Design a protein with these regions (language model features):
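Active-site beta-strand->loop->alpha-helix modules in alpha/beta enzyme cores, enriched
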Residues: 1-163
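Short, flexible loop segments at boundaries between secondary-structure elements
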Residues: 156-183
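A short, structured beta-strand-centered segment in the mid-to-C-terminal lobe
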Residues: 184-189
Length: 190
Protein backbone atom coordinates (compact mmCIF):
# COMPACT_ATOMS: atom_id res chain seq x y z
CA UNK A 1 0.00 0.00 0.00
CA UNK A 2 1.35 3.40 -0.99
CA UNK A 3 0.19 6.66 0.56
CA UNK A 4 0.71 8.91 -2.46
CA UNK A 5 0.62 12.69 -2.23
CA UNK A 6 1.04 15.01 -5.21
CA UNK A 7 2.23 18.58 -4.73
CA UNK A 8 2.05 21.23 -7.43
CA UNK A 9 4.52 23.97 -6.60
CA UNK A 10 3.15 26.54 -9.05
CA UNK A 11 -0.27 27.50 -10.37
CA UNK A 12 0.84 27.02 -13.98
CA UNK A 13 -1.49 29.87 -14.86
CA UNK A 14 0.50 31.47 -17.67
CA UNK A 15 0.60 28.15 -19.54
CA UNK A 16 -3.17 28.31 -20.09
CA UNK A 17 -4.23 30.03 -23.29
CA UNK A 18 -6.77 32.84 -23.51
CA UNK A 19 -9.10 30.71 -25.67
CA UNK A 20 -9.38 28.17 -22.83
CA UNK A 21 -10.34 30.95 -20.43
CA UNK A 22 -12.96 32.22 -22.86
CA UNK A 23 -14.40 28.71 -23.21
CA UNK A 24 -14.64 28.14 -19.45
CA UNK A 25 -16.01 31.63 -18.84
CA UNK A 26 -18.67 31.07 -21.50
CA UNK A 27 -19.63 27.83 -19.75
CA UNK A 28 -19.71 29.61 -16.40
CA UNK A 29 -21.78 32.47 -17.84
CA UNK A 30 -24.29 30.07 -19.38
CA UNK A 31 -24.72 28.08 -16.16
CA UNK A 32 -25.21 31.30 -14.21
CA UNK A 33 -27.70 32.55 -16.80
CA UNK A 34 -29.77 29.40 -16.25
CA UNK A 35 -29.61 29.17 -12.45
CA UNK A 36 -28.59 32.60 -11.17
CA UNK A 37 -29.15 35.26 -13.83
CA UNK A 38 -28.34 38.19 -11.53
CA UNK A 39 -25.08 36.64 -10.37
CA UNK A 40 -21.90 38.68 -9.93
CA UNK A 41 -20.10 35.55 -11.18
CA UNK A 42 -21.94 35.82 -14.50
CA UNK A 43 -20.98 39.49 -14.73
CA UNK A 44 -17.33 38.67 -14.01
CA UNK A 45 -17.33 35.90 -16.63
CA UNK A 46 -18.73 38.33 -19.22
CA UNK A 47 -16.17 40.96 -18.24
CA UNK A 48 -13.30 38.49 -18.71
CA UNK A 49 -14.70 37.26 -22.04
CA UNK A 50 -15.01 40.82 -23.37
CA UNK A 51 -11.56 41.76 -22.14
CA UNK A 52 -9.88 38.74 -23.75
CA UNK A 53 -11.81 39.03 -27.01
CA UNK A 54 -11.78 42.76 -27.60
CA UNK A 55 -9.54 44.69 -25.22
CA UNK A 56 -6.41 42.72 -24.39
CA UNK A 57 -3.22 43.99 -25.99
CA UNK A 58 -0.03 41.91 -25.91
CA UNK A 59 2.36 44.55 -24.61
CA UNK A 60 4.55 42.74 -22.10
CA UNK A 61 2.44 43.90 -19.17
CA UNK A 62 1.48 41.41 -16.45
CA UNK A 63 -1.76 39.52 -16.99
CA UNK A 64 -4.82 40.79 -15.10
CA UNK A 65 -5.38 39.13 -11.70
CA UNK A 66 -8.88 37.90 -12.57
CA UNK A 67 -7.60 36.28 -15.78
CA UNK A 68 -4.69 34.70 -13.87
CA UNK A 69 -7.17 33.35 -11.34
CA UNK A 70 -9.24 31.73 -14.10
CA UNK A 71 -6.14 30.31 -15.79
CA UNK A 72 -4.85 28.94 -12.49
CA UNK A 73 -8.24 27.42 -11.69
CA UNK A 74 -8.36 25.69 -15.08
CA UNK A 75 -4.88 24.25 -14.53
CA UNK A 76 -5.71 23.24 -10.94
CA UNK A 77 -8.83 21.32 -11.99
CA UNK A 78 -6.94 19.59 -14.82
CA UNK A 79 -4.37 18.49 -12.23
CA UNK A 80 -7.01 17.40 -9.73
CA UNK A 81 -8.76 15.35 -12.43
CA UNK A 82 -5.48 13.67 -13.41
CA UNK A 83 -4.79 12.80 -9.78
CA UNK A 84 -8.27 11.34 -9.29
CA UNK A 85 -7.88 9.29 -12.46
CA UNK A 86 -4.60 7.94 -11.05
CA UNK A 87 -6.21 7.06 -7.72
CA UNK A 88 -4.78 9.90 -5.64
CA UNK A 89 -7.26 11.05 -2.98
CA UNK A 90 -8.40 14.69 -3.10
CA UNK A 91 -6.95 15.43 0.34
CA UNK A 92 -3.57 14.16 -0.90
CA UNK A 93 -3.35 16.75 -3.68
CA UNK A 94 -1.54 19.91 -2.59
CA UNK A 95 -1.46 23.19 -4.50
CA UNK A 96 1.38 25.25 -3.06
CA UNK A 97 1.06 28.30 -5.36
CA UNK A 98 4.63 29.38 -4.63
CA UNK A 99 4.80 33.19 -4.74
CA UNK A 100 7.91 33.36 -6.99
CA UNK A 101 5.75 32.21 -9.93
CA UNK A 102 2.90 34.68 -9.52
CA UNK A 103 4.19 37.58 -11.62
CA UNK A 104 1.68 37.34 -14.45
CA UNK A 105 4.65 37.22 -16.83
CA UNK A 106 6.93 34.55 -18.28
CA UNK A 107 9.78 36.05 -16.22
CA UNK A 108 9.46 34.98 -12.62
CA UNK A 109 10.71 36.36 -9.32
CA UNK A 110 13.67 34.83 -7.53
CA UNK A 111 13.09 32.08 -5.01
CA UNK A 112 12.31 33.53 -1.58
CA UNK A 113 12.28 32.30 2.01
CA UNK A 114 8.49 32.24 1.80
CA UNK A 115 8.63 29.82 -1.15
CA UNK A 116 11.06 27.55 0.68
CA UNK A 117 9.03 27.65 3.89
CA UNK A 118 5.86 26.58 2.05
CA UNK A 119 7.65 23.50 0.69
CA UNK A 120 9.26 22.81 4.06
CA UNK A 121 5.88 22.92 5.83
CA UNK A 122 4.48 20.33 3.42
CA UNK A 123 7.50 18.06 3.90
CA UNK A 124 7.13 18.28 7.68
CA UNK A 125 3.42 17.50 7.39
CA UNK A 126 3.76 14.50 5.06
CA UNK A 127 7.20 13.14 6.04
CA UNK A 128 7.65 11.37 2.70
CA UNK A 129 9.65 8.18 2.13
CA UNK A 130 10.24 9.15 -1.49
CA UNK A 131 10.01 12.37 -3.46
CA UNK A 132 9.86 12.67 -7.22
CA UNK A 133 10.87 16.12 -8.44
CA UNK A 134 11.33 17.64 -11.88
CA UNK A 135 15.02 17.55 -12.67
CA UNK A 136 14.39 18.92 -16.12
CA UNK A 137 16.74 21.89 -16.02
CA UNK A 138 16.49 22.45 -19.78
CA UNK A 139 13.15 24.21 -19.18
CA UNK A 140 13.63 27.45 -21.16
CA UNK A 141 11.61 29.47 -18.64
CA UNK A 142 13.64 28.29 -15.63
CA UNK A 143 10.56 27.34 -13.61
CA UNK A 144 11.62 23.72 -13.09
CA UNK A 145 15.00 24.83 -11.72
CA UNK A 146 13.45 27.26 -9.25
CA UNK A 147 11.00 24.57 -8.12
CA UNK A 148 13.85 22.09 -7.68
CA UNK A 149 15.84 24.71 -5.74
CA UNK A 150 12.83 25.24 -3.44
CA UNK A 151 12.65 21.51 -2.68
CA UNK A 152 16.42 21.21 -2.17
CA UNK A 153 16.48 24.25 0.14
CA UNK A 154 13.58 22.80 2.16
CA UNK A 155 15.29 19.39 2.32
CA UNK A 156 18.45 21.08 3.59
CA UNK A 157 16.46 22.45 6.53
CA UNK A 158 14.76 19.15 7.41
CA UNK A 159 17.66 16.79 6.65
CA UNK A 160 18.19 15.96 10.34
CA UNK A 161 14.59 14.85 10.89
CA UNK A 162 14.29 11.14 11.70
CA UNK A 163 12.06 10.40 8.70
CA UNK A 164 14.63 11.90 6.31
CA UNK A 165 17.11 9.09 7.05
CA UNK A 166 15.16 6.76 4.77
CA UNK A 167 13.78 9.32 2.34
CA UNK A 168 14.95 9.10 -1.27
CA UNK A 169 14.72 11.92 -3.80
CA UNK A 170 14.26 10.96 -7.43
CA UNK A 171 14.55 13.44 -10.29
CA UNK A 172 12.71 12.94 -13.55
CA UNK A 173 12.86 14.54 -16.97
CA UNK A 174 10.79 14.47 -20.08
CA UNK A 175 9.09 17.75 -20.84
CA UNK A 176 12.15 19.56 -22.19
CA UNK A 177 15.05 17.07 -22.27
CA UNK A 178 15.76 13.40 -21.69
CA UNK A 179 18.47 12.10 -19.36
CA UNK A 180 21.81 11.14 -20.88
CA UNK A 181 22.35 7.38 -20.54
CA UNK A 182 25.33 7.78 -18.18
CA UNK A 183 23.26 9.93 -15.80
CA UNK A 184 20.43 7.44 -15.29
CA UNK A 185 20.43 5.69 -11.90
CA UNK A 186 17.10 3.92 -12.36
CA UNK A 187 14.78 3.56 -15.33
CA UNK A 188 11.15 2.52 -15.07
CA UNK A 189 9.60 1.26 -18.30
CA UNK A 190 6.08 2.57 -18.90
Amino acid sequence: HHDVHVAYETSGNIAVGDEEVIRYCEYLRDVCEKYSPDSAVKDKANEIINYLRYEKVENGEPERKDVLFMKGTIRREEARHGCRYSGVKDDHVHFLDLPFYETGLVKKNDLSEVDKDIVKALLLEIKPDQMFVAGDLADPHGTHKVCLDAVLAAIDEVKDEEWMKNCRVWMYRGAWAEWEMDHIEMAVPI
